[in-house]
């Protein structure tokens, strides 16, 4: 069933209303978000028909900077977001999971005052299984002088300083979850009018939840502390109700379910591979934006050692971290088991 745009609030209307509340607003942020959303709509369209097009679905021969084989849709999404955002006139520099170095604004285009760090297509290894995937982004205000090309230091800022963060979930419907530091709002794409409509205002994650999300296939490689925590929440001692395990393998999808229903998502480090001693998720464009959303929705986000994610400042573009995020009381319970950082 389609939603009539005159009876509800579109994302465009929402952004303008928020802009009018700030006397100092210039409209730059609103315009930047419009470009990002435009790119997301294009990617959403391709995701929906990916199974029909042989040249969109599946892997390419290239390997990205993370050492991961790029899926064709991954590559496509990266090109769409890069082209749209760097030519928007509101961005000074872009950081992407798919590029080893930062992506500058092309010659001849206006240099703006914002930075964006982005994972163009999170969970892309699940594309051919038709599992929900998504785009994650983080927005900062530049630190370098206005009008000059952006620098890496403009991107490497503490998570608590984010001007906005969000994700687009490409699932049974396409949703945008947006946080500008004043709560969390959810928008659903109405295909009949091509607009994101405010469907989930003032989102709050339940304080507790009965769901835990972790890749239990790595159990034997975890620290004893993480093993003890998982055993505890699965225990039925004393008549307790054990928590239910739900793990999709797509950060956006797992986080989104827990945001709505309550629960906890964990991605600890392990000894399975020496390649990721500090965890596998990227701090700048995965952990930090999700932490920003979680805290604004009343939840918590920490490393496996109990450090607040938003207090961390990345030292490099693709810095990795552990992540424990979700309902406040569930994360607090995890902290009782958290290992000490050596």
Curated annotation (Swiss-Prot):
It holds the Pfam family FBPase. It is found in: Cytoplasm. SUPFAM superfamilies: Carbohydrate phosphatase. Keywords: Carbohydrate metabolism, Cytoplasm, Hydrolase, Magnesium, Metal-binding. Mg(2+) 1 binds at residues 97, 119, 121. Disulfide bonds: none annotated. GO terms for biological process: fructose 1,6-bisphosphate metabolic process; fructose 6-phosphate metabolic process; fructose metabolic process; gluconeogenesis. It catalyses: beta-D-fructose 1,6-bisphosphate + H2O = beta-D-fructose 6-phosphate + phosphate. Its EC number is 3.1.3.11. InterPro entries: FBPase_C_dom, FBPase_class-1, FBPase_N, FBPtase, Fructose_bisphosphatase_AS. One of its GO terms (molecular function) is magnesium ion binding. Mg(2+) 2 binds at residues 119, 122, 286. One of its GO terms (cellular component) is cytosol. Its cofactor is Mg(2+). Belongs to the FBPase class 1 family. Homotetramer. PANTHER family: FRUCTOSE-1,6-BISPHOSPHATASE-RELATED, SEDOHEPTULOSE-1,7-BISPHOSPHATASE, CHLOROPLASTIC. This is Fructose-1,6-bisphosphatase class 1.
């Amino acid at each position: 069933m389609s939603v009539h745009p005159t009876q509800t609030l579109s994302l465009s209307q929402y952004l303008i209303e928020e802009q009018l509340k700030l006397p100092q607003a210039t409209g730059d942020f609103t315009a930047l978000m419009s470009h990002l959303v435009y790119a997301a709509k294009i990617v959403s369209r391709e995701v929906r028909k990916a199974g029909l097009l042989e040249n969109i679905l599946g892997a390419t021969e290239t390997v990205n900077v993370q050492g991961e084989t790029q899926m064709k849709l991954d590559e496509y999404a990266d090109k769409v977001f890069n082209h749209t955002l760097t030519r928007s006139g509101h961005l000074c520099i872009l950081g992407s999971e798919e590029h080893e170095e930062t992506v500058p604004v092309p010659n001849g285009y206006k240099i703006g005052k914002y930075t964006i760090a982005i994972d163009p297509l999170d969970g892309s290894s699940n594309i051919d299984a038709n599992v929900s995937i998504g785009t994650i982004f983080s927005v900062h205000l530049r630190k370098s002088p206005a009008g000059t090309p952006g620098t890496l230091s403009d991107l490497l800022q503490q998570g608590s300083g984010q001007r906005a963060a969000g994700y687009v979930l490409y699932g049974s419907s396409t949703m945008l979850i947006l946080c500008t530091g004043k709560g969390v709002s959810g928008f659903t794409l109405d295909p009949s009018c091509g607009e994101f409509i405010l469907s989930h205002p003032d989102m709050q994650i339940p304080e507790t939840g009965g769901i835990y999300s972790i890749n239990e296939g790595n159990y034997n490689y975890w620290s004893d502390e993480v093993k003890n925590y998982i055993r505890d929440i699965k225990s039925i001692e004393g008549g307790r109700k054990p928590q239910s395990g739900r793990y999709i393998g797509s950060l956006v999808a797992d986080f989104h379910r827990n945001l709505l229903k309550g629960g906890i998502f964990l991605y600890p480090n392990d000894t399975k591979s020496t390649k990721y001693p500090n965890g596998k998720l990227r701090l700048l464009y995965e952990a930090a934006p999700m932490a920003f959303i979680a805290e604004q929705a009343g939840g918590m986000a920490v490393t496996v050692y109990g450090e607040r994610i938003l207090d961390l400042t990345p030292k490099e573009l693709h810095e990795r971290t552990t992540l424990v995020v979700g309902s406040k009381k569930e994360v607090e319970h995890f902290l009782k088991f958290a290992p000490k950082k050596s």
